A protein has these predicted regions:
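DNA-binding recognition helix and immediately preceding turn/loop
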Residues: 144-164
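Hydrophobic/aromatic residues located in beta-strands of well-ordered beta-sheets
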Residues: 4, 30-31, 79
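CheY-like receiver
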Residues: 42-148
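Short hydrophobic/Thr-rich beta-strand motif most characteristic of the beta2 strand and flanking loop
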Residues: 25-35, 43, 91
Length: 164
């Protein structure tokens, strides 16, 4: 399951996130719902979530600052901006810092599941790419170990590149 943390300063939105979204169906585990950006950053450091859902306007650290922080420190983390503002400058900032999706609160029940599906799809693709790269590295490591072993066993003999 993908680990999700969320932050919104409005209590009814926090409750909606906890109770109205079928997280298990989305293959997600909502591990924490917080009320400000500073708590969210602390939680990100402790929990290492795969997906972060954040409101824009919150006390202390706002959601756009959280988005920028994740872009700079944990670029693989998928960010979903949840906001009451359809302001183009906010959307532009979110795009600049690689937010996965921008969801308006008035359509949270319709758009958030789609945004989560998009985020989990990106994470699944990223995981496959990492596994593929790790497999290639492992194969190269095995080949280098075989070459090293051969050279160690035969270093006193004449070895030409043609022979190898």
């Amino acid at each position: 399951m993908w680990k999700v943390v969320a932050a919104d300063d409005e209590g009814y939105i926090r409750e909606a996130l906890k109770k109205l979204i079928n997280w298990e169906k989305m293959n997600c585990d909502l591990v924490s719902v917080l009320e400000d950006g500073q708590e969210l950053i602390q939680c990100i450091e402790n929990e290492s979530p795969d997906i972060v859902i954040t409101d824009i306007q919150m006390p202390g650290v706002n959601g756009l600052e959280v988005c920028k922080y994740l872009y700079e420190t944990r670029p693989e983390t998928q960010v979903i901006i949840l906001t009451a503002y359809s302001d183009f400058d906010y959307a532009k900032f979110a795009i600049k810092y690689n937010a996965c999706e921008y969801v308006l609160k008035i359509s949270i029940m319709d758009e958030l599941p789609e945004a989560l599906e998009k985020a989990t799809g990106k994470l699944t693709q990223l995981k496959k790419e990492i596994e593929k790269e790790e497999s290639a590295v492992s194969e190269q490591r095995t080949l280098l170990q075989q070459i090293d072993q051969y050279v160690e066993q035969n270093f006193k003999n004449k070895i030409s590149m043609n022979y190898m």
